[in-house]
Amino acid sequence: MRGIAITMAIAMTSILGAQSQTVVIYPKNGEPIKYRASEVDHIEILPATDEDDTNQVEVTEHYCQKGESQIYGKLYRPEGVAAALPTVVCAHSASLTADAMNAYANALAEAGYCAYAFDFCGGSEDSRSDGSVEDMTISSEEADLKAVIADLQQLECVDATQMFVLGSSQGGLVAALTAEDQSLDLKGLILFYPAFNIPDLIAMMDQFGGFGGGFGGFGDMFGGGYSEAFCDEMRDFDVYANIGTFSRPVKIIHGSNDIIVNVSYSEQAVAVYPNATLDIIQGANHGFNADNLGGFGGMGGANTDYDSEVIPLVLEYMSTNAPL
């Protein structure tokens, strides 16, 4: 006698009745399966598994316009879903590109959200957006992010009323400052090890060759130098006096072993925001996976992939604040 475990839709002409009757199983995909009742010992219907809960992801290149400049990016969305979806804009760290945010954008799309990762203008030598590294400043990156948000809100696949930003390191600082613009009506922020310490680093490194590239320049930690315009803008800038009016939910995720941005900067931010939480990833340095490590990020434990801890936190935040 055979026992049958059924995890699909079924229809039966008999529930173990007369021996001449048959049991017919109708899979979601494939041909019906028939058994004589005499062949069946019992029928067990098991709960469905989560194996099919993730969506296939469609990734397309999409350019946004900022004045005469084009901003390169990639749009991630669930394949075959036509509805307008809550959308997360991913803002990368200094010296990196949109590619560094692939794991997070892809995970969001698999979960049913829309995500967009873009290259800041002059954000690195590898940027596919217009602009040069020499012209990049924090305020120029704020303008990039605002232009991206405005552009995406015009897309049919984007729910313009449910826009979030996920920013890492310098991208996290830019995201935090940008969110203070109430006209954007962002619904929330997710910040990975936000670089709220940049003004302090500039002040410190002014004593040791400056914040630019070259031996002794702290810019080397991030993979490249910084312009005088960048340093002048952020020198003596009070980050915490310029954030904190954003009242929507803020999720900050920071590594306990971060040697570039100490976790204390995020602890201070949580005290400033009216609605913020901090999750500390034990053992993580400046970057939660290999795509997001700065020049010194590989030291002190960051070579390990922490996305198995980080991505569930991101998805939990989204399911709470933008349920599908």
Residues covered by each model-derived region:
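Conserved alpha/beta-hydrolase
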Residues: 107-128
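Catalytic active-site module of serine/aspartate enzymes centered on a nucleophile-bearing elbow/loop
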Residues: 292-324
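Hydrolase active-site cap/lid region
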Residues: 177-229
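Alpha/beta-hydrolase active-site loop
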Residues: 100, 134-156
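Active-site glycine-rich loops that stabilize anionic/oxyanionic intermediates
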Residues: 85, 92-96, 256
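The serine-hydrolase catalytic nucleophile loop
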Residues: 94-106
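Short beta-strand/loop motif that positions the catalytic acidic residue
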Residues: 246-247, 252-254, 258
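N-terminal cap/lid segment of alpha/beta-hydrolase-fold proteins
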Residues: 52-80
